Amino acid sequence: MELPANVQNQLMQFQQLQQQLQMIMYQKQQFETQLKEMEKAIEEMEKSGSDEVFKMAGGILIKRNKAEVKEELSERVETLQLRVTTFEKQEEKMQKRYTELQENLQKAMGQGQ
């Protein structure tokens, strides 16, 4: 059975959207992982009684002021939170479009039978 051109087009859009949605979800997951790591690092630094901490830079550890490192990490956390929020919004919009396309395809396939 040959599918009509509009159904083939919708099917291609559906497959492309599915791939894009998977990429968005993967990227969001990566940022969420980084965010948790940063938050854990800040938490561990706060437990430390020392005013200095060691920071990894290019494969070596460098002694740094704890307050400066905490500020850097806090800024990074803010950036990551913003990115995660952006990806959540994109994911939500794509998921809605995905569901709409899926329903349209199911209707079109049902009518063709």
From Swiss-Prot:
Pfam families: Prefoldin_2 (PF01920). GO terms for molecular function: unfolded protein binding. It is found in: Cytoplasm. Keywords: Chaperone, Cytoplasm. Its main location: cytoplasm. One of its GO terms (cellular component) is prefoldin complex. InterPro entries: PFD_beta-like, PfdB, Prefoldin. The keyword Cytoplasm applies. GO terms for biological process: protein folding. Belongs to the prefoldin subunit beta family. NCBIfam families: gimC_beta. Molecular chaperone capable of stabilizing a range of proteins. Seems to fulfill an ATP-independent, HSP70-like function in archaeal de novo protein folding. Heterohexamer of two alpha and four beta subunits. This is Prefoldin subunit beta. It comes from Methanococcus maripaludis (strain C7 / ATCC BAA-1331). The gene is pfdB.
